[in-house]
Amino acid sequence: MAKAKFERNKPHVNVGTIGHVDHGKTTLTAAISHVLAKTYGGEAKDFSQIDNAPEERERGITINTSHIEYDTPTRHYAHVDCPGHADYVKNMITGAAQMDGAILVVASTDGPMPQTREHILLSRQVGVPFIIVFMNKCDMVDDAELLELVEMEVRELLSEYDFPGDDLPVIQGSALKALEGEPEWEAKIIELAEALDSYIPEPERDIDKPFLMPIEDVFSISGRGTVVTGRVERGIVRVGDEVEIVGIRATTKTTCTGVEMFRKLLDEGRAGENCGILLRGTKRDDVERGQVLSKPGSINPHTTFESEVYVLSKEEGGRHTPFFKGYRPQFYFRTTDVTGTIELPEGVEMVMPGDNIKMKVTLICPIAMDEGLRFAIREGGRTVGAGVVAKIFA
């Protein structure tokens, strides 16, 4: 069969493997790569290439991650796999590899284990929207009833964390046997790929979302008015659009009267572009770095939220000592630091460097935020933690 030529016009979807240590995440990643390359064309990556994950730095945090790509007839996938549990925690909290969906790998010889639960909880906290289950090592279990029990257990665990445990796809397979080329197990990998295609919806592109631009700088241009600059995070702003200035102070409305990029006047600014936006009737002192410019009504300012936080270890340049309740660091959102206080979960007295923890944060002034927004925790300009907004209270 002729190999289909790779085209960039297919929808791009980000996925990853999650699950307990030694349940076969990396073997499955290699099996998907091999079976799909063999079936639909593309380059296969083997286990050792994936397992030997390169180090990356995201917000000063060292993370080992492997990125591979593969294709199905209708989509292009970018897939992330991490060697160690700590790498998953860091990856999910910093958003270094944001996932449109995850493949939860559970060894049917073991059933759900502690990290299975922790990865499901993390997925819920950081906003991974869809999970598909791959029950691995099914070639080692002869008892069909046992497989059924494990499947029920996994589904119940997912339901416990508000995923649709009863309805999501569960595929029973063997990554190793598929990698070794046994047809009945290769077919299970194709079944998994088909589940990815049908169960994970096509992600909305940044450009189709409501306009938002974090304000980095403010200038006043004589005879023209006030210009704010920044990189458009999502959406499109057009000349004549009404926009809101949100965060830190009371929300105000104004109109975009011009868009500039590299000293050229444009009709619009789009997601990913650095531009200057001229605001009608806005004074230089009405707006500051740390606020955002957004489509009216699309985002609100908040001060209190629950977050999932990773605290940098000493080796990563973080704190050398634990912190306790009453800790008041700065929380860095998009372009600015805001002081806040923390509340630790019941029964937790202190947090050690290298831990990940759920904490409630109250900021001294409101910031434009949605669930899923990433932030850094800093002390005097030094990053000591990374977090994600899990749930907004006020």
Swiss-Prot record:
Molecular-function GO terms, alphabetical: GTP binding; GTPase activity; guanosine tetraphosphate binding; translation elongation factor activity
Region (G1): 19-26
Cellular compartments annotated: Cytoplasm
Chief location: cytoplasm
Gene3D superfamilies with a match to the protein in the record: P-loop containing nucleotide triphosphate hydrolases, Translation factors
Annotated spans, G5: 174-176
Superkingdom of the organism of origin: Bacteria
GO cellular component, one term: cytosol
Enzyme Commission no: 3.6.5.3
Keyword Nucleotide-binding in annotation: yes
Catalytic activity: GTP + H2O = GDP + phosphate + H(+)
UniProt-annotated binding residues for Mg(2+): T26
Pfam families: GTP_EFTU, GTP_EFTU_D2, GTP_EFTU_D3
Region listing for G4, in residue ranges: 136-139
Domain (tr-type G) ranges: 10-204
Keywords tagged on the record: Cytoplasm, Elongation factor, GTP-binding, Hydrolase, Magnesium, Metal-binding, Nucleotide-binding, Protein biosynthesis
Entry binding sites for GTP: 19-26, 81-85, 136-139
Residue span of region G3: 81-84
Family annotation (InterPro entries): EF-Tu_GTP-bd, EF-Tu_GTPase, EFTu-like_2, EFTU_2, G_TR_CS, P-loop_NTPase, Small_GTP-bd, T_Tr_GTP-bd_dom
Region (G2): 60-64
Record PANTHER family: ELONGATION FACTOR TU, MITOCHONDRIAL, ELONGATION FACTOR TU-RELATED
Reported function: GTP hydrolase that promotes the GTP-dependent binding of aminoacyl-tRNA to the A-site of ribosomes during protein biosynthesis.
Subunit structure: Monomer.
Protein name, UniProt field: Elongation factor Tu 1
UniProt source species: Shewanella sp. (strain MR-4)
